[in-house]
Structures are given as structure tokens and as C-alpha cells.
Amino acid sequence: MSTPMIFAIPSKGRLKDQVEAWLADCGFKLEMTGGARGYSAELSGLPGVSVRLLSAGDIAAGLDSGDLHLGVTGEDLLRERGDDMDSRVMLLRALGFGRADLVVTAPKNWLDVDTMADVDEVGHAHLARTGRRLRVATKYVTQTRAFFARHGVADYRIVESSGATEGAPAAGAAELVVDITTTGATLAANGLKILSDGVILKSQAQLTASLTAGWNGEQLDALRRLLSVVEAKGRAGKLATLVWPAEQDRAAQDAVAAFIARGGSRRANGALLATADLFDAAAALAEAGVEPVTVSRPDYVFESRSAVLDRFAEALKSKI
């Protein structure tokens, strides 16, 4: 019996709903195998894949350790696993949802503090005056240390937070906060401001593959089929097909030749073009007297090779 590719998605919350909607848009229906409240599922139309529903943090850990082959989780959680993340996982596709920024914040009433250089100065002064380093409350220890080091800030210490990190300064537990935010509203409500150069990471949900998992041929084939559909759906959203009468094909092809030259492709009595070129191409056809011209949007645009899969396969070979 073959061993399926293990694909993990978030088990609850808005991110779970967004992942399910994304899969459905690609044509894959999530079918629970453990009942409505279960934590395992299958994807209709994609055999050889076992879906696990886990917390976003557990997905990041499972991809890092190799217990999972594939997963969707936040980039912030993946990068928190260590500076050498890229040696253990590969980000295959940014999904465009689950967006949040990991940011450095200071109290609003620190009027002279707007940049990391200002934090460095305040840290020196605070240490000289009190004998203590600035305290930075965060759950994101790895990324905080790396970011502060890149900016040459040394006079601080981490206060690891497990609760509402943004409340640490008001509670007297820290001077600065590094936290994840979508709108900044919660930080502002707690009297904090984001430093002008304090964005550590602009995170979003990532389709991610493990480089430490054991992959066999069948599992790689399942990944290939999944990526083929995902990439075809992504391409389709950027393309449109123009169709014109067969008897006007020569004039039409001449009219759209410039758009074909920069990445479009010819079709029988038509052309597949980038949506960004759609109206300019329609205008060129009208000027050439070609009519009527209809436009349709493809559901999928498949190509024979996946550059992403090729890159992943090469990375796997280098691990052997």
C-alpha cells in the first residue's frame, strides 16, 4: 500500500476558511474523513494525499521536522523556526491571504523615537542611566534578535510573552513590543506606534514543502499534480482570450502582433493575452476594423513544466 503525501492545513479560524476557499477555487473539495469535527480529510480529485488539520504553529513545526510533506501556514511562523529556514523548507507559493506584519513598536509618548537608530540611542542612554537594558516583549524571539542585530541594536533583552504582548509596556513588563499585526489598531489602542523602519516581515499564508521529509516518487507525483492545478489557476487569473471572425484572422493577427511578441500566444481565430493588455489589444483590433471581438476568461491555463517543482526537486537532490 502506497504512503500518501501528508498535506496540513489550519484547523480553525479565518485562515482555515480562506484555505478551504482557495482549494475550492482550484477545484479541490475538502472531504472530512473523521466526521465534521475530525482532523483528517481528503481532497476530491487528488488521490494519494492525506490532509491533516492542525494549528498553524504545529504546521510550521511539522514542516520543519519533516513530519509533514506539505502545508499552508504563515510565513512568520516558518521564519521563527530559525535563520536557516530555507535549508529545511521551501516556500512554493504565496497565497495572498492571511496577511500580517511583524513589527517593532514603541510607546507613542516616546516622541523622539521613530527609527531603529533611535532605539539604539535610547538603549545606550537607558543602560547608562539605570544599569538595565531595554526590555522587548515578543513571541518572535528568533526574528527579533536577527532584526535588532541587522540594525546594530545590542542594549536590550528579550522578555518572552505568551499572552497579550501589546499590553506589556502598560503593565510595566517591557519598554518595546515586537508583535504581529494586520491593521495596527490593537497596538494603537494600547498606546504603541510602529517604528518607521520597524517592519521585520510582511507575512502571508504560504504553500510550503518540507525539505526534511522523506519524499518518494508517488508523493512527488501528488505534489506535481497539485502544483499543476494551482499554477494553472493562478495563470488563468492573469489572462484572457480574444476571439474574432475567421475571415478577419489575418488582419486581426497583424493588429495584435505586438502583444503576442511580449508574451501572448496565438489561437485559432484568436489570441491569449495578459489581462493588462486586454483593452489596448481591443483598441488595436477596432482600429484595424476587426469586429465583433469577444472576450472570455479561462478557468485554467496549464503548462508542461513547473519551474517551482523543478526547483524543489533540485533542492531535494542537494539534501541527499
UniProtKB/Swiss-Prot annotation:
Any GO CC annotation of this UniProt entry: cytoplasm
Reactions performed catalytically: 1-(5-phospho-beta-D-ribosyl)-ATP + diphosphate = 5-phospho-alpha-D-ribose 1-diphosphate + ATP
Keywords: Amino-acid biosynthesis, ATP-binding, Cytoplasm, Glycosyltransferase, Histidine biosynthesis, Magnesium, Metal-binding, Nucleotide-binding, Transferase
GO molecular function: ATP binding; ATP phosphoribosyltransferase activity; magnesium ion binding
Pathway in which the depicted protein is active: Amino-acid biosynthesis; L-histidine biosynthesis; L-histidine from 5-phospho-alpha-D-ribose 1-diphosphate: step 1/9
Documented activity regulation: Feedback inhibited by histidine.
Compartments (UniProt record): Cytoplasm
GO BP: L-histidine biosynthetic process
PROSITE patterns from the UniProt entry: ATP_P_PHORIBOSYLTR
Group of enzyme by EC: transferase
InterPro entries for this protein: ATP-PRT_HisG_long, ATP_PRibTrfase_cat, ATP_PRibTrfase_CS, ATP_PRibTrfase_HisG
Needed cofactors: Mg(2+)
E.C. number: 2.4.2.17
Its job: Catalyzes the condensation of ATP and 5-phosphoribose 1-diphosphate to form N'-(5'-phosphoribosyl)-ATP (PR-ATP). Has a crucial role in the pathway because the rate of histidine biosynthesis seems to be controlled primarily by regulation of HisG enzymatic activity.
Record family assignment: Belongs to the ATP phosphoribosyltransferase family. Long subfamily.
PANTHER family in UniProt: ATP PHOSPHORIBOSYLTRANSFERASE, ATP PHOSPHORIBOSYLTRANSFERASE ATP-PRTASE
Protein's UniProt name: ATP phosphoribosyltransferase
Gene encoding the protein: hisG
